[in-house]
Amino acid sequence: MNLAEGVQVVSFGILATMLIGTALGVVLATSIVYSAFLLGGVFISIAGMYLLLNGDFVAAAQVLVYVGAVNVLILFAIMLVNKRQDFTPYPSAGIRKVLTAIVSVGLFALLSTMVLATPWAYSTTPKVGDGSIIVIGEHFFSDFLLPFELASVLLLMAMVGAIILARREYLPEVTPSGLPQTVLTLPERPRELVGAGSETQE
C-alpha cells in the first residue's frame, strides 16, 4: 500500500500491538476455544502486515486460507474432541520444562541473530516489475515445487484426519435380535439402532 510514512508507522504500531496482544491471548487464555478465536486475530494482524508490504495477494491468501480454513478446522477439531478430563500431572514434568526452556532460548537466540545480521535497508520507491501473483506462481512451480507439494500432502493428511475424527461408527455386521432389518434402515445412526435392539431384548 502506498501510504504516507507517518500513516505507515501508525498502522504498523497498531498491527504490531494487535499481533502481540492476540498472540499472548492464545497462550494465556484459559479456554481453548477462546485461544482458537484469538488465533484468528493473529492471522488477521499478519495479513495487515502483508498489506503494508504491498503483498495484496499474500494478505488475501492469509485471510482465506488461515482464517477461513485452518482456524475453522481447528475450532471443529476442538469442539469434536473436547472432552473434560481431570488434570493429572506427568511424572517427568520437570524434564519437559527444562527441554521447553532450552528450545525456547535456542529459538530466541536464533531469531535475535537473524534480526541483528539481516540488512534492513529498504527503498521506499517501488520496483517496476511483475505483480506479486506472477512472482509467487513462478516460484511455486520452479524453486519451491517440492515444499509446495509437501504442503499439499500435509493438508491432505489433515483433512483425512479430520474426517476420521468426525465420522460415525458403522452398523455392526450382525443385526441385533428382535430388530427388523429393512431397506429404510439408515447406517449413519447406529447408536439409536443398537439402543433399540437392547430395549427389545429386555
Swiss-Prot record:
It catalyses: a plastoquinone + NADH + (n+1) H(+)(in) = a plastoquinol + NAD(+) + n H(+)(out); a plastoquinone + NADPH + (n+1) H(+)(in) = a plastoquinol + NADP(+) + n H(+)(out). The keyword Nucleotide-binding does not apply. The keyword Transmembrane applies. It is a multi-pass membrane protein. Keywords: Membrane, NAD, NADP, Plastoquinone, Quinone, Translocase, Transmembrane, Transmembrane helix. The chain crosses the membrane at residues 9-29, 32-52, 61-81, 98-118, 144-164. GO terms for molecular function: NADH dehydrogenase (ubiquinone) activity; quinone binding. Its EC number is 7.1.1.-. It is found in: Membrane. It holds the Pfam family Oxidored_q3. One of its GO terms (cellular component) is transmembrane transporter complex. Belongs to the complex I subunit 6 family. NCBIfam families: PRK06638.1-3. NDH-1 shuttles electrons from NAD(P)H, via FMN and iron-sulfur (Fe-S) centers, to quinones in the respiratory chain. The immediate electron acceptor for the enzyme in this species is believed to be plastoquinone. Couples the redox reaction to proton translocation (for every two electrons transferred, four hydrogen ions are translocated across the cytoplasmic membrane), and thus conserves the redox energy in a proton gradient. This is NAD(P)H-quinone oxidoreductase chain 6. It comes from Nostoc sp. (strain PCC 7120 / SAG 25.82 / UTEX 2576). The gene is ndhG.
